[in-house]
Swiss-Prot record:
Belongs to the RecO family. Keywords: DNA damage, DNA recombination, DNA repair. The lineage of its organism: Bacteria, Pseudomonadati, Pseudomonadota, Gammaproteobacteria, Legionellales. It comes from Legionella pneumophila (strain Lens). This is DNA repair protein RecO. InterPro entries: ARFGAP/RecO (IPR037278), DNA_rep/recomb_RecO_N (IPR022572), NA-bd_OB-fold (IPR012340), RecO (IPR003717), RecO_C (IPR042242).
Length: 229
C-alpha cells in the first residue's frame, strides 16, 4: 500500500453506489488520475468535490486503484461565471479527453493554475480568449503535438511576413492554400503577441484545428455553451 499527498483539482465526478464517488483528478505530482472517494456523497465531501476548488488530497494505492484518504480545500472556490465559467469547463474537458492517466507534467499543471486564475480575474472576453489560446498551446506541447510558427513545415524555410500560409493538422504551416493565414500573424503568435484582434483571430483558427486533431473526433460540450475555441 502506497500513500501520497497531492495538489489536485476535480476534473470530473461520477457517483458510484450509494456512498462513493469516482473522481478524475488533475494533480501536480501524478498528472490525471482516476480515484475512488468512499463516503463522497456526504455533505462535507460533496462541498469539496467540485470543479475549481484547489484541493490537498491524500490517497493510497491498492491493486492499481487509487483511493482517497483525506481531502481538504487549500482555498475557496474560484469565482467563475459567464464566459469565465464556460472557459473553465472547456479546459477541464480538454484535460479529460486528451491526457493519459498517471503522466505528470508540472508545467501543464502550472499553466492550468495560471489560466484558471487569469479567467477568474479577466473582465474582457478578448483577455479570456488569449488565456485559452496559451493554455491550448501548453496542452499541445504536453501531448507531444507541436509545430513551428517560424518555419514552413515541408521546406523548413523561414516564415515570411508578407506571404500567406495554410495550417495542416499534424504538420504545421505550408505556403499558400485555400485557408490562408498571413505570415505576419504567425510570427506575432510565435512571439506570444495576441494583443491585436487579427492575431487573436488567427490564433483561435489555428488552435481550433490543432485541438480538433488532438481530440480525434471527440466532442467538447463546453464549445456549445460559449464557443471559446
Amino acid at each position: 500500500m502506497t500513500s501520497k499527498s497531492l495538489s489536485a483539482w476535480v476534473i470530473h465526478k461520477q457517483w458510484s453506489g450509494d456512498t462513493s464517488a469516482r473522481l478524475k483528478l488533475f494533480t501536480r505530482e501524478l498528472g490525471l488520475i482516476n480515484c475512488l472517494c468512499k463516503g463522497g456523497r456526504t455533505p462535507k465531501k460533496q462541498s469539496l468535490l467540485q470543479a475549481f476548488i484547489p484541493l490537498w488530497v491524500s490517497i493510497e494505492e491498492r491493486y492499481d486503484q487509487y483511493y482517497t484518504r483525506n481531502i481538504e480545500s487549500t482555498s475557496s472556490r474560484l469565482d467563475l461565471e459567464g464566459h469565465s465559467l464556460f472557459s473553465g469547463l472547456y479546459i477541464n474537458e480538454l484535460l479529460y479527453y486528451t491526457l493519459s492517466p498517471d503522466f505528470p507534467d508540472p508545467d501543464l499543471f502550472d499553466a492550468y493554475l495560471f489560466t484558471l486564475n487569469g479567467i477568474a480575474l479577466a473582465r474582457e472576453r478578448e483577455a479570456i480568449e488569449a488565456l485559452l489560446r496559451r493554455f491550448e498551446w501548453a496542452l499541445l506541447k504536453a501531448c507531444g503535438y507541436t509545430f513551428s510558427f517560424l518555419h514552413e513545415a515541408r521546406t523548413g524555410e523561414l516564415i515570411v511576413p508578407d506571404s500567406y500560409y495554410q495550417f495542416v493538422a499534424g504538420e504545421g504551416f505550408i505556403l499558400g492554400g485555400d485557408k490562408e493565414i498571413p505570415g505576419e500573424h504567425l510570427l506575432a503568435i510565435a512571439a506570444d503577441n495576441l494583443s491585436e484582434p487579427a492575431y487573436l483571430k488567427s490564433a483561435k483558427f489555428i488552435m481550433r484545428q490543432a485541438i480538433n486533431h488532438l481530440l480525434g473526433g471527440r466532442e467538447i460540450k463546453a464549445r456549445s455553451l460559449y464557443g471559446p475555441a
